Amino acid sequence: MAMNPPITPGEILLEEYLQPMGISQNAMARAVGVSPRAINEIVLGKRAITPAMSIRFGAFFSQSPEFWHGIQVECDFRALAKDRKRLTAKIRPATELAESGQQTAA
């Protein structure tokens, strides 16, 4: 059975905040001082919510910026989950190097 793709930060922004509050993407963009394209690309999942954007979103929605940053980080980790084995295949744990007494040049 195919799994649905994970919900993106942009979907949360649109479906949980903008639509219920009756706020357009353009109005939000003007209010937070970014281009409408930036907000639209976040909504479409084509752009990430950066730490700077998290600060703007937090101020706009009267929330902590960490909330928006956390949503983005969680999404980023979910996207990398399928590549985890490939990314870590050749990495030796630090404890293994320490136990073997190997040192690297500074």
For every predicted segment, state its role.
Residues 67-106:
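Short, charged recognition helix plus adjacent turn
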Residues 17-18, 62, 73, 82:
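A generic structural signal for secondary-structure junctions
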Residues 18, 29, 58:
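The alpha-helix within a helix-turn-helix
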Residues 46-59:
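Short, basic-rich loop-to-helix N-cap that marks the start of a DNA-contacting helix
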